[in-house]
Amino acid sequence: MDILISSNLERLLFDLSGENDVEVKGYMDQLSKEGCYEVSDAIKAALKERYWGGYCGEEDTAKTIAAYNTKYGYLIDTHTAVAVNVMEQYRAETGDETTTVFVSTASPYKFCNHVLSAIGEEPKADGVELLDQLHEVSGVTVPRRLAALKGKNRRFDLTAEKQDMEKVVLDFLK
């Protein structure tokens, strides 16, 4: 997914530019022609005033999953772990202890390998068999739709490099 072509980002730029549609269209045109754009100093200043950003790599993601599992008995997925970790960075830097709600939309079962490794378990299987291992270790119920995959045949096993995607898709459609 190319987040630079996100309608949410475009709406944010529109808001931060003082609803300057010509400026935002210029960014989108530049993105289309050059593959990137740089926003104005005014938009950068507005972003810095309203937002705080951080970074969470794989190691810190795993540590956060393990910490929340140990401290709260709650198994979080990798995406939620990044959000939690960056929130903790924000609190440490700013001292802001405002109550925070995380709306976690992913399941730890979507990332079994990473979650198992994070909680100190070596993944011992592959594919849907990992669902059982994570369930045995965590006690967290496997989501119904993922559990329904057990025993089903794999429909697709083709992988493609980015530069080959167009050809692979066209060949598949023949």
Model region roles, listed by residue range:
Residues 1-174:
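PLP-dependent amino-acid enzyme catalytic core
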